[in-house]
Swiss-Prot record:
UniProt-annotated binding residues for [2Fe-2S] cluster: C122, C195
Protein name, as recorded: Dihydroxy-acid dehydratase
Enzyme class: lyase
One CC-aspect GO term: cytosol
Cofactor note: Binds 1 [2Fe-2S] cluster per subunit. This cluster acts as a Lewis acid cofactor.
Pathway noted in the entry: Amino-acid biosynthesis; L-isoleucine biosynthesis; L-isoleucine from 2-oxobutanoate: step 3/4; Amino-acid biosynthesis; L-valine biosynthesis; L-valine from pyruvate: step 3/4
Catalysed reactions, semicolon-separated: (2R)-2,3-dihydroxy-3-methylbutanoate = 3-methyl-2-oxobutanoate + H2O; (2R,3R)-2,3-dihydroxy-3-methylpentanoate = (S)-3-methyl-2-oxopentanoate + H2O
Organism: Pectobacterium carotovorum subsp. carotovorum (strain PC1)
Coiled-coil ranges from the UniProt annotation: none
Entry-linked HAMAP family: IlvD
Modification N6-carboxylysine, positions: K124
Length: 616
């Protein structure tokens, strides 16, 4: 029988000093012996997805205390990728994931907490907390801040839905007037919450549902809606029960590694492919799997990507649907229901509700449930009122979207395509693989061949695109932007956005060892592994080289014979200490980022730290 971790600091005469300090935080004799639950918050005024979280930690804590636990809250950092994007700030985004994971470990282990409620939302915060949860392997429930309402404005006598990416495209398009650009900017992000499309934040919050670590509705219920409050209340109550089941009943089934096992990781990836999630999710799932010692690799992702259809199309792949529309159609459970009916899911998995997948679908799938309260929850809709307040409105859709033929979520029979929304490509340009979000690729670009235009920084590529040096048919190659080479594996949303604004979104390809925002669409191929800084072939590409991309056949190739490629590799190695570094790039890199780069692995390993360099 495991004993409460917190007993280390609350029991025994030798812990008198620790108890004295606990008393100074408000604990009493009656609290020593109760489970101490860490409320891992991520409130910050820098990030719209987190600006409303200040009071939500207290909300969870009150429920923990009322349910027989002791709540202790702390905060992690949170970087806003959209604000950090397009300048040196983006170098810090991915490394912040490791800092978040480490900070959670540090706080929880230093104070011997027994369990956690993780209040996350945006791009690197959910992955960082997920990595920490699987590393620590103590009971945990995730509850995120929720998605933002989609922006809306009237253009050309039509009301259209908007998001952050629309503001970026309009701002870079010289054909758009200043007045229209400002109108879109002011309308694109109307409320608190994670950006309204199927970008990285929302993708990851959906995947925590599929992993079994969060409650139904977590990924899609709007941040502003009053119904979302119940998720926080339930999390506070339920985590105490999970802690007691483990520590008092020796029930290991409630531990995150037993919930988020190999089968659950496969289900999460199947969901990701079906909903055309952000390519960043691949990076984060691989990293989380390593923390949980789950044998889940790029090989598994490649296998699944060939089996799963594309069942849910959401911005940025279409302007028609945003997360509020996914929720109306049944949210994550609605997509999982269609995948289950297609025979694609592992059914022998459990979740923090204590339910199996079939039990969860029966209770929460809008196509199956008879529970009016569940149907009411999925009818929660937007209010269209600018606000930074959580739970501030109670608007509802007139009806649910249960049209599986032409609605937001489709059945397998009526899938957007029988090929899923993500694919892994292999070839001499990416021997360990690279990732493309096929959900955002125009059908006419699935097979593409063109000359390379090579840039050794995102900044140089942006200047070339906006300067008219990139033309239709080109393959833009941006290298030395991987985890080690950047360092920090910047997102390339600005280059892809500017290709669109210059009218090249469907006539050019972009390949990088960096990564893409969840807001990216078009023929954008990232995570090329090995990266340039690790000796990857992408470092050897020269201007004018022909690159061949064949998504249906999952291949990507530098059209160059082996002898020529070997000659280039030898020439690069001959550079000595300068080998596998940019030839002509000026970039100031801080000590903190250099420390990150010294241990970083390529994207096919999740860009985690290389434990072998630490002797572990």
């Amino acid at each position: 029988m495991p004993k409460y971790r917190s007993a280390t600091t609350t029991h025994g005469r030798n812990m008198a000093g620790a108890r004295a300090l606990w008393r100074a935080t408000g604990m009493t004799d009656n609290d020593f012996g109760k489970p101490i639950i860490a409320v891992v918050n991520s409130f910050t005024q820098f990030v719209p997805g987190h600006v409303h979280l200040r009071d939500l930690g207290k909300l969870v804590a009150e429920q923990i205390e009322a349910s027989g636990g002791v709540a202790k809250e702390f905060n992690t950092i949170a970087v806003d990728d959209g604000i950090a994007m397009g300048h040196g700030g983006m170098l810090y985004s991915l490394p912040s994931r490791e800092l978040i994971a480490d900070s959670v470990e540090y706080m929880v282990n230093a104070h011997c907490a027994d369990a956690m409620v993780c209040i996350s939302n945006c791009d690197k915060i959910t992955p960082g907390m997920l990595m920490a949860s699987l590393r620590l392997n103590i009971p945990v429930i995730f509850v995120s801040g929720g998605p933002m309402e989609a922006g809306k404005t009237k253009l050309s006598d039509q009301i259209i839905k908007l998001d952050l990416v629309d503001a970026m495209i309009q701002g870079a398009d010289p054909k758009v007037s200043d007045e229209q650009s400002e109108q879109v900017e002011r309308s694109a992000c109307p409320t608190c919450g994670s950006c309204s499309g199927m970008f990285t934040a929302n993708s990851m919050n959906c995947l925590t549902e599929a992993l079994g670590l969060s409650q139904p509705g977590n990924g899609s219920l709007l941040a502003t809606h009053a119904d979302r409050k119940q998720l926080f209340l339930n999390a506070g109550k339920r985590i105490v029960g999970l802690a007691k089941r483990y520590y008092e009943q020796d029930d290991e089934s409630v531990l995150p590694r037993n919930i988020a096992n190999k089968a659950a990781f496969e289900n999460a990836m199947i969901l990701d492919i079906a909903m055309g999630g952000s390519t960043n999710t691949v990076l984060h799932l691989l990293a989380a799997a390593q923390e949980g010692e789950v044998d889940f690799t790029m090989t598994d992702i490649d296998r699944l990507s060939r089996q799963v259809p594309h069942l849910c199309k959401v911005a940025p792949s279409t302007q028609k649907y945003h997360m509020e529309d996914v929720h109306r159609a049944g949210g994550v459970i609605g997509i999982l229901g269609e995948l289950d009916r297609a025979g694609l899911l592992n059914r022998e998995v459990n979740n923090v509700l204590g339910k199996t997948l079939p039990e969860t679908l029966e209770a929460y799938d809008v196509m199956l449930t008879q529970d009016d309260s569940v149907k009411s929850m999925y009818s929660a809709g937007p209010a269209g009122i600018r606000t930074t307040q959580a739970f501030s409105q109670d608007c509802r859709w007139d009806s649910l979207d249960t049209d599986r033929q032409e609605g937001c979520i489709r059945s397998r029979e009526f899938a957007y395509s029988q090929d899923g929304g993500l694919a892994v490509l292999y070839g001499n340009l990416a021997e360990n693989g690279c990732i493309v979000k096929t959900a955002g690729v125009d059908e006419g670009s699935l097979v593409f061949r063109g000359p390379a235009k090579v840039y050794e920084s995102q900044d140089d590529a942006v200047d070339a695109i906006l300067g008219g040096k990139v033309v239709a048919g080109d393959v833009v190659v941006i290298r030395y932007e991987g985890p080690k080479g950047g360092p920090g594996m910047q997102e390339m949303l600005y280059p892809t956005t500017y290709l669109k604004s210059m009218g090249l979104g469907k006539s050019c390809a972009l390949i990088t060892d960096g990564r893409f925002s969840g807001g990216t669409s078009g023929l954008s191929i990232g995570h090329a592994s090995p990266e340039a800084a690790s000796g990857g072939t992408i470092a050897l590409v020269q201007d004018g080289d022909i690159i061949a991309i064949d998504i249906p056949n999952r291949s990507i190739a530098l059209v160059l014979d082996d002898n020529a490629l070997a000659s280039r590799r030898a020439a690069e190695e001959a550079r000595g200490d300068q080998a596998w570094t940019p030839h002509n790039r000026e970039r100031q890199v801080s000590f903190a980022l250099r420390a990150y780069a010294s241990l970083a692995t390529s994207a096919d390993k999740g860009a985690v730290r290389d434990k072998s360099k630490l002797g572990g």
